[in-house]
């Protein structure tokens, strides 16, 4: 059995393909979705999206929040923004993490602190996507 996965952002279609399984970050934690999953509508949190292809290869994407609808073996994810793990430059991601950590340490005031924490969270998620090791089959 398979799932039809669509990942859409206002700028582009990130994913439109049949898959075996996904692991999705929601506001209440990560959920795994296999064929014949119970229907669900859920908010999507910032975090990784793990995609298991029909050939059992795993890919990673990063979602920057949104909404997901799962029904009748179809998953539609409407995201504010997203990027495929393969599109993330590991060196650039590491540099962004270091900058975010430095900015957090020198943040002053509530607004700067909130912005620095958000930038750090985004940087860590991107690093996680780049460094993720898929489970062995």
Swiss-Prot record:
GO molecular function: ATP binding; proton-transporting ATP synthase activity, rotational mechanism
Main localization, broad class: plastid
Pfam families in the record: ATP-synt_DE (PF00401), ATP-synt_DE_N (PF02823)
Keywords for this protein: ATP synthesis, CF(1), Chloroplast, Hydrogen ion transport, Ion transport, Membrane, Plastid, Thylakoid, Transport
Keyword Chloroplast: yes
Residue ranges of coiled coil: none
InterPro entries the record matches: ATP_synth_F1_dsu/esu, ATP_synth_F1_dsu/esu_N, ATP_synth_F1_esu_C, ATPsynth_dsu/esu_N
Similarity comment: family membership: Belongs to the ATPase epsilon chain family.
Subunit note: F-type ATPases have 2 components, CF(1) - the catalytic core - and CF(0) - the membrane proton channel. CF(1) has five subunits: alpha(3), beta(3), gamma(1), delta(1), epsilon(1). CF(0) has three main subunits: a, b and c.
Protein name per the record: ATP synthase epsilon chain, chloroplastic
Originating species: Agrostis stolonifera
Lineage: Eukaryota, Viridiplantae, Streptophyta, Embryophyta, Tracheophyta
Name of the encoding gene: atpE
């Amino acid at each position: 059995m398979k799932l039809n996965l669509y990942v859409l952002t206002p700028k582009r279609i990130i994913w439109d393909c049949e898959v075996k399984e996904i692991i999705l970050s929601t506001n209440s934690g990560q959920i795994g979705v296999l064929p014949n999953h119970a229907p669900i509508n859920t908010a999507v949190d910032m975090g990784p999206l793990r995609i298991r292809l029909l050939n059992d290869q795993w890919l990673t994407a990063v979602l920057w929040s949104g909404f997901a609808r799962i029904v009748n073996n179809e998953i539609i994810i409407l995201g504010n923004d997203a990027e495929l793990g393969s599109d993330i430059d590991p060196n650039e991601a590491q540099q962004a993490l270091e900058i975010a950590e430095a900015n957090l340490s020198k943040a002053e005031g509530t607004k700067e602190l909130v912005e620095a924490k958000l930038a750090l969270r985004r940087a860590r998620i991107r690093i996680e996507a780049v460094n993720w090791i898929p489970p062995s089959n």
